[in-house]
UniProtKB/Swiss-Prot annotation:
Class of enzymatic activity (EC top level): transferase
Entry EC number(s): 2.1.3.2
Keywords from the UniProt entry: Pyrimidine biosynthesis, Transferase
Superkingdom classification of source: Bacteria
Pfam families linked: OTCace, OTCace_N
Organism: Synechococcus sp. (strain JA-3-3Ab)
A GO term from the CC aspect: cytosol
Name this protein carries in UniProt: Aspartate carbamoyltransferase catalytic subunit
The keyword Transferase appears for this protein: yes
Name of the coding gene: pyrB
Gene3D superfamilies: Aspartate/ornithine carbamoyltransferase (3.40.50.1370)
Residues involved in L-aspartate binding: K86, R181, R239
Reported function: Catalyzes the condensation of carbamoyl phosphate and aspartate to form carbamoyl aspartate and inorganic phosphate, the committed step in the de novo pyrimidine nucleotide biosynthesis pathway.
Length: 326
């Protein structure tokens, strides 16, 4: 099988075959990461540039480590110390890196659509350079959606994670869905896998029209937590993004936790083997109680971090021209 997609800008148009290629390749790199020397020369000589116009430690570090594990040369762009502060446009900055011989651009921006703009400019120039969206505004965060998918499938079958494992499985996504690009990518991936996706959150953070977020599908929307949790096999809880919120969307963090915080008592409504995911960073005592957060038998948060490196290795490898066995 050969990867055909030059840019990964979102999951809205991902095919089942593409999801499966990412899962299969991620599983291979997850094995690489367990070796004494967790490094392979597959992208040796390639130049990967991280263009992060929005603060990030976890995602940027994960991408940088993934690229280095593939033996790529990594350039980290910092807008505060760049020519952008002197008036250079974003496109001019990107053109500079293209002229330097970059092979892959990893882009994170607070404004939705910026990675698409860069990809359009690259396509206009006929360049083979790929753009990988590391999160853009309220649009999408495709690598988080893919690593969450890989984490879920790997939990159900560590040796052969695959899309169909989630068919008919109830998964609740809880929290600030309105401001979450992670939620949007997760929804696309989980619906593609055939999961039964339920959305839960306060009315101010979960508009009713999210029920029709994926064309051709109707997602249950709950403004109370309990119906979403009943029988759920997995629960993905989201960070309250206070930096993106206007005033008056929430009375207080304490009230949010009272109605939507995940506690051990509330989780008794779920499947007996329920597992929790969270994209991080976690607001302890808000989205999750400290008791739940500290229980490694209950949450898959550390696995998400580990799997994030493997999934990003897989995407960089595939976009860099790598193949997987048929």
């Amino acid at each position: 099988m050969v990867w055909q997609r030059q840019h990964v800008l979102g999951l809205a148009d991902f095919t089942p075959e593409e999801y499966q290629m990412v899962l299969q390749t991620s599983a291979s790199f997850q094995e690489v990461l367990t070796r004494r020397l967790p490094k392979v020369p597959t992208l040796q000589g390639k130049v990967v540039v991280t263009l992060f116009f929005e603060p990030s430690t976890r995602t940027r570090s994960s991408f940088e480590l993934a690229a280095k594990r593939l033996s790529a040369d990594v350039l980290n762009f910092s807008p505060g110390t760049s020519s952008l502060s002197k008036g250079e446009t974003l496109l001019d900055t990107a053109r500079t890196f293209l002229a330097m011989g970059s092979d892959l651009l990893i882009v994170r921006h607070a404004q939705a659509g910026v990675p698409q703009q860069l990809a359009a400019e690259i396509d206009r120039r006929g360049s083979p350079v790929g753009v990988l969206n590391a999160g853009d505004g309220l649009h999408e965060h495709p690598t988080q959606g893919l690593l969450d998918l890989f984490t879920l499938c790997s939990h159900l079958d560590p040796r052969r994670p695959r899309l169909e494992l989630l068919q008919g499985i109830k998964i609740a996504i809880v929290g600030d869905i309105l401001h979450s690009r992670v939620a949007r990518s997760d929804i696309y991936a989980l619906v593609a896998a055939g999961a039964e996706v339920h959305l839960a959150g306060p009315p101010t953070l979960l508009p009713k029209d999210f029920a029709h977020f994926v064309p051709g599908h109707t997602l249950p929307v709950h403004w109370q937590l309990e119906p979403a949790l009943e029988g759920a096999r997995f629960v993905i809880t989201l960070r309250l993004q206070q930096e993106r919120m206007g005033e008056f969307l929430l009375p207080s963090l304490q009230e949010y936790h009272h109605f939507f915080g995940l506690t051990r008592q509330r989780l008794r409504l779920c499947h007996p083997d329920v597992k929790l995911l969270h994209p991080g960073p976690v607001n302890r005592g808000v989205e999750l109680s400290s008791e739940v957060m500290e229980d490694p038998g209950l949450n898959l948060i550390e696995q998400q971090v580990t799997h994030g490196v493997a999934v990003r290795m897989a995407l960089l490898y595939l976009m860099g021209g790598g193949r997987i066995p048929a």
